Amino acid sequence: MTYTGLMQASLDSGNIQDGSYIFEKMKDICAPNLVTYNIMLKAYVDHGMFREAKELFEQMLENTNHLSRNDDYKMRVIPDIYTFNTMLDACAAEKKWDYFDHVYQRMLYHGYHFNPKRHLRMILEASRAGKVTFLFFFLHIMNDPL
């Protein structure tokens, strides 16, 4: 059985602490891949552990700051669209609009784009919370042909 399988089994049974422990121990033996990071991130979010999810996400973002050679892509895990969507959902659920903006800006920086079906609900929630700049920014994006 793999570390990811053990971690997933712990998380599926609702045991976040054991899943997190396995994830951390895995780093001592082998490098977790993107799927493993996303599984752990989603588990933190699903169990209301926003701070832990944010820390893990920031670790992934930090990895992108250390990419200088092609070989670095094999050793470091960088966020994908699933990672960004998971964090955007978490920010919206927790009403962390300033961090939502940070995550969204990083998503754009990494080459992922606004998805009206996926993100519009969150943008409207942010604008209702007084983050009017989000609404204007996204309306501009939607009206700006590529």
Where are these regions (language model features)?
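Acidic/polar low-complexity surface segments
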Residues: M60-S68, D72-K74
